[in-house]
Amino acid sequence: MIHRVKTFTEEDCNKIETIVDNLDKLWINRSCERRFAFENSFKISRAPFWTLGAVSYLDSTQDPERYAKHKTYLNPVLIKKFNWIYEIICEKLQREFSEPVVIDKFLAHPGFHIFATKTGSVLEPEYLKLFEEPLGSVHVDVQYEEHYDYWHSFKEVDLENTLSFTIPINLPTHGGGLYTWEDIVDPLLFNYTTNENKLDELESPSVSNLYNKGEMIYFIGHLLHQMMPGTQLQPTDRRITVQGHGVKCDGVWRLYW
């Protein structure tokens, strides 16, 4: 089930985007995956997909040392620049759960997905076409699997009812959102890889959950989902979101990415 919580004001979102842009030298290019490539006889273009922050599903799954390196370098920056938004997020979720919520200090802090060009440039036509395709994988969130050793340091850990959340900071002109399905699937098969043959196995119809700027969307557990592609994208469109996960450890929700 999808839950919605108004989290940031318009002013907050504008301030956050400005800070994200000012940190663009720290953006990590994630466009190397083939599904983000536009290829013809003349060139191969990479659609602009970046993250600000270390990411379990991109870094730790491929190279745990890279995840550790990124989080060690970027966590202090994120805390310095975005501690105020972490306080808001924790406060909002504490109201939702009636339980303590903290930013975990050991794992990577919640960060940003950035589907956009850097300030001063616009999306090229081939990028617009790519972003109107379903680039995101159909998957369930199992990022916690990358950190089993850490979870074992706590007495009680709930890895069934884990938290995933997204907060849109900027959205394309015609919006964005999340597809979800009710199907119960094998996480090993419905992971972060390509979508080949996945949709053929699903019995339930997809549900379109449209985003609202500044409004958190979150869910608990292994909900099957996929990033919705763009619609009638414009060269100046941007899709910037805060992303994070949470695990309840010894009665405290610990947020990470």
How does the language model describe each region?
Residues 190-257:
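Catalytic core of Fe(II)/2-oxoglutarate
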Residues 116, 182-184, 246:
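Residue-level signal for short segments within beta-strands and strand-turn junctions
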